[in-house]
């Protein structure tokens, strides 16, 4: 399986993960270890940045996993930029997952505010990874202003509904010149495999791993699914057909018998 490059950083795993909803820090680390994920997103709201022994942050830093702070909870571009600057100072990283969702019920991303924040953050030297609707026009605009990737949703956050937005994801993948990471709604390893099969460069999974009865085993399942999906894509999937096509035609064989 080929490596993925974002802003010059090489990732051997195409499975990115989150840190929310786990029953404990130990369960989180067991799951992440089994998944072999090399990038983990985490919310500033859930961390005690002044506490060097924070039970989420410290084990992640010890594992040398790349940390991707997110701006979850921001309702405007201004709030998102402020959160990103706090994260850069506290975690010494200029990478940020840009999330702006003013609606607390459905957590739908605000595309207009996201574009405004992305432009400002890029000017400030951030590597911006924006979480957005599966909107091909918006994703292209974000690419044009300098985002290093785009992160369209498969379905609503935490819904486990899979790739409900597949037709639009396929358009985004087809026209994008930056990595496409499908984020949100991936509820089963089969969803992750499908995402990679249709050409997504990576997926970000959190809820499906965190709420599983055995998070570590689910982490491994997602790792294998992502590897299989990417391998299938790189191998070249067969074309879908309406009509049947025999794998072993009998025409010549039957003619020789007559």
Swiss-Prot record:
GO biological process, one term: thiamine diphosphate biosynthetic process
CDD domains: ThiG
CC terms in the record's Gene Ontology section: cytoplasm
Subcellular location: Cytoplasm
Chief localization: cytoplasm
Pathway, per record: Cofactor biosynthesis; thiamine diphosphate biosynthesis
List of catalytic residues: 97 (schiff-base intermediate with dxp)
Tagged with keyword Transcription: no
InterPro entries, alphabetized: Aldolase_TIM (IPR013785), Thiazole_synthase_ThiG (IPR033983), ThiG (IPR008867)
Record function comment: Catalyzes the rearrangement of 1-deoxy-D-xylulose 5-phosphate (DXP) to produce the thiazole phosphate moiety of thiamine. Sulfur is provided by the thiocarboxylate moiety of the carrier protein ThiS. In vitro, sulfur can be provided by H(2)S.
Description of how the protein assembles with itself and partners: Homotetramer. Forms heterodimers with either ThiH or ThiS.
Family: Belongs to the ThiG family.
The protein's name: Thiazole synthase
Organism, scientific name: Marinomonas sp. (strain MWYL1)
């Amino acid at each position: 399986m080929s490596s993925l490059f974002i802003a010059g950083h090489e990732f051997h795993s195409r499975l990115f993960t989150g840190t929310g909803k786990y029953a404990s820090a130990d369960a989180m680390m067991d799951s992440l270890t089994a998944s072999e994920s090399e990038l983990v997103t985490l919310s500033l709201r859930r961390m005690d940045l002044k506490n060097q022994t924070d039970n989420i942050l410290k084990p992640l830093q010890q594992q040398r996993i790349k940390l991707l702070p997110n701006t979850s909870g921001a309702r405007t571009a201004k709030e998102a930029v402020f959160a990103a600057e706090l994260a850069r100072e506290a975690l010494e990283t200029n990478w940020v997952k840009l999330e702006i969702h003013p609606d607390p019920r459905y957590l739908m991303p605000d595309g207009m505010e996201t574009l405004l924040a992305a432009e400002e953050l890029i000017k400030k030297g951030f590597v911006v990874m924006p979480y957005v609707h599966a909107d091909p026009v918006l994703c292209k605009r974000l690419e044009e202003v300098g985002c290093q990737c785009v992160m369209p949703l498969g379905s609503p956050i935490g819904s486990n509904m899979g790739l409900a937005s597949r037709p639009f994801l396929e358009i985004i993948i087809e026209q994008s010149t930056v990595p496409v990471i499908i984020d949100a709604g991936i509820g089963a390893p089969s969803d992750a495999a499908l995402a990679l099969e249709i050409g997504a460069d990576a997926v970000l999974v959190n809820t499906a791993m965190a709420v599983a009865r055995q998070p570590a085993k689910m982490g491994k399942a997602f790792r294998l699914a992502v590897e299989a999906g990417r391998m299938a894509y790189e191998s070249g999937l067969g074309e879908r057909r309406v009509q049947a096509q025999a794998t072993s035609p009998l025409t010549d064989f039957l003619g020789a018998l007559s």
